[in-house]
């Protein structure tokens, strides 16, 4: 996939808040995406990423999904954080969505070293957050990070594959689901299918790396055209889906 060409296409058609007639999406643009993040939270974010960028801890990766051909199986934490999308404006998007909509039961697929997990928690510290990570060493590092930030009571980390976790029978109904792992289009669609019984009409699904590969972009386009998702929003790197069966189907390509 030519990511530069994809970005040019996206930039030419992406909208801001003007010309949007959906009340929900207009509010998202006007009151959520444009809302300033407090200096306290910004300071917290900066301290986290400064610490991680200087962490030479080596993690041996077990690849359970479609790992990038350009990334080694053994990487330092400071190498991992340079490719982590939740350290920039997309991390701010996670924070703002959590802060604005106050989801109380949250599921994250793909803890990695815990950056996205912390952004989700900081957005709504009252939420009960479950985060799944299949790689044992990555899970152990993220666990230490949660302990250092003293949020182990609000964040439950589980060392499991996504499929094994979804086999459990007594799962909560989740208000927000963030999927950042595996990077296989077919599997992404299968996970969302399995999550149907564990989510509700207003559950917000956030999908990371929708342009990771042609396969992932094809999966995203399939989901956009799926009649059960009545709202879909393309933020270029991330995509957002909500079922909202009481609303007419709409798709938006928004500038972040």
Tell me what each language-model feature is.
Residues 1-176, 183-204, 210-256:
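A short alpha-helical cap/connector motif
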């Amino acid at each position: 996939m030519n990511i530069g060409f994809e970005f040019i296409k996206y930039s030419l058609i992406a909208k801001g808040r003007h010309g949007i007639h959906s009340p929900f999406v207009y509010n998202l643009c006007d009151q959520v995406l444009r809302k300033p993040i407090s200096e306290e939270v910004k300071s917290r974010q900066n301290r986290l990423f400064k610490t991680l960028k200087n962490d030479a801890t080596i993690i041996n990766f077990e690849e359970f999904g479609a790992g990038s051909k350009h990334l080694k199986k053994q990487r330092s934490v400071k190498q991992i954080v340079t490719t982590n999308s939740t350290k920039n404006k997309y991390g701010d998007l996670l924070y703002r969505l959590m802060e604005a909509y106050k989801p109380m039961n949250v599921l994250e697929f793909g803890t990695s070293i815990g950056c996205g997990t912390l952004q989700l928690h900081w957005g709504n510290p009252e939420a009960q957050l479950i985060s799944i990570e299949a790689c044992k060493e990555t899970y152990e590092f993220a666990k230490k990070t949660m302990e250092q930030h003293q949020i182990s009571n609000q964040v439950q980390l589980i060392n499991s594959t996504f499929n094994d976790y979804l086999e459990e029978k007594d799962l909560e109904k989740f208000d927000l689901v963030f999927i950042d792992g595996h990077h296989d289009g077919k599997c992404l669609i299968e996970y969302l299918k399995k999550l149907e019984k564990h989510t509700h009409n207003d559950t917000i699904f956030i999908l990371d790396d929708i342009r990771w590969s042609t396969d992932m972009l094809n999966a995203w386009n399939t989901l956009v055209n799926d009649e059960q998702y009545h709202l879909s929003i393309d933020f270029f790197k991330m995509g957002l889906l909500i079922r909202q069966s009481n609303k007419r189907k709409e798709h938006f390509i928004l500038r972040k």
